Amino acid sequence: MQNLPKWKIVLSIICTVFAIICALPNFIQINWKFLPHDSVNLGLDLRGGANLLLDVDFDTYLNDSMENIADTLRKNFREHKIGYKNLLVRHNNIQLEVRSTEVLKSLKKIIHKIDPEIIIEVNKNKIKLRYSESRLNDLLNKVVEQSIEIVRMRIDSTGTKEPILQRQGNKHILLQVPGVDNPSYLKNILGKTAKLTFHLVDENANIEEAIKGHIPLDSMLIKGDSEHHGEYYIVIKKKVLLSGTHLTKASASFDQNSQPMVAFSFNNLGSKIFTEITKNNTGKRLAIVLDNKLLSAPMINGAIIGGDGIITGNFTIESANELALLLRVGSLPTPLKIIEERSIGPNLGADSIESGKKAGLIGFTAVCIFMILSYGVIGLFANIALILALLYILALLSLFQATLTLPGIAGIILTMGMAVDANVLIYERIKEELHKGVSNLYAIRTGFESAFATIIDSNLTTLIVAFALYIFGVGAIKGFAVALTIGIISSMFSAIIITKLLIDIWVKYFKPEKLGLL
């Protein structure tokens, strides 16, 4: 008498019930808190949405870094009374001339104190400062990783579900956001660096002369926008008194005149700096600048204690909310340029889903008919195992919130054939044993045992390929790899455990004289 392994029965029941619970939200809405309620996430090609390829402007980042170093050098040279001239930033290098080569030793010490990784090239009294290639690569990787993280936080703050965000090539970022109805808003929040800085207004500068290009060395000309006066210019000090890196909160609100504004709060350090700035500069104007554009320049009437402030300007409710979002998340290390944009409509996604359903249904039906015609009753068991494998796949995709793409559907359809292939291999081995004249029980046990190693080997090699596709692939390729991996694991379980259990139950309780394989 064939004894049914209890662990197989328990495992099969638990897995099947759990799979039904996880897959159920794809068909009906469940509001019970103790049950899973997430359905499968549909990718861009199935749901529609926006596909953006972003270019990280590393040259701007490098140039800004060199400008900051150059400003620090000027300050240090004045403090140490080192004579120099023609200190300029060109082609991401710093160039200068010293009046005497005797100061080179002191100069090198100052430079390495600012940044020990700067390479110093000396040609008589001319000096060139630059970064090595390895240092540039490290900086590029850092900037790209920071940009990806900031973009992810900005997208997540909009409530968008399951954005696909990954590095592509050297300095490109691929962003796919399914289900986006307003790509222009998406581009708007990505197109801003959101670098917030506070400067004193240069009250002594002549605006007309500054517009002509005659600007004091320690000042700069920036543009503002007023609801009443339109565009205008103002001269501010270059020195950044405080930056947005110290912000902890930012939210859209309304002022006493019911006009939109942005309220913000600083952390402890930022609050102390803000208090000192307002205390020491009473009667002066403080310029609030975002991405080199003036937001406002209010008069400082006295020390502001507590670290809270407001930004007023020509805001709408939408622009105030947008600015608050950008300030909360933080600034990008460098601007991002959209170099490629594609939008996929929801109708096209619906057509893709319908095509995938038809292909899957045709493939499933053909496989089921083939198995029944070829193997009779145990072919039916293979079909039942196949249905359960599809259930497990759907459950795992829902449980792990994996994104299903059109290539992912292709991967699932492919695993349907692979699942049946394992059963075919097992059944052919059983048939070989039956031809030797052995009993049904012995043929079944030997057939499964002899086919087991072959099934594991073939599926393992496919899994290795799927892992490689996931690691090195992008976008749809990753979706295919995920679906293929989940499909292989599910099909192996159904072929080895479920099919064997169904055949054992049939043989034990129905005691067929023949298995229908001869």
Swiss-Prot record:
Transmembrane segments annotated in the record for this chain: 9-29, 356-376, 377-397, 406-426, 451-473, 486-506
Gene Ontology CC: plasma membrane
Intracellular or extracellular location(s): Cell inner membrane
Molecular function GO terms recorded: protein-transporting ATPase activity
Annotated membrane topology: Multi-pass membrane protein
Keyword tags: Cell inner membrane, Cell membrane, Membrane, Protein transport, Translocation, Transmembrane, Transmembrane helix, Transport
GO biological processes: intracellular protein transmembrane transport; protein targeting; protein transport by the Sec complex
Domain of life the protein comes from: Bacteria
Its job: Part of the Sec protein translocase complex. Interacts with the SecYEG preprotein conducting channel. SecDF uses the proton motive force (PMF) to complete protein translocation after the ATP-dependent function of SecA.
Subunit structure comment from the entry: Forms a complex with SecF. Part of the essential Sec protein translocation apparatus which comprises SecA, SecYEG and auxiliary proteins SecDF-YajC and YidC.
PANTHER family: PROTEIN TRANSLOCASE SUBUNIT SECD, PROTEIN-EXPORT MEMBRANE PROTEIN SEC
Family: Belongs to the SecD/SecF family. SecD subfamily.
The protein's name: Protein translocase subunit SecD
Protein species of origin: Rickettsia typhi (strain ATCC VR-144 / Wilmington)
Protein encoded by which gene: secD
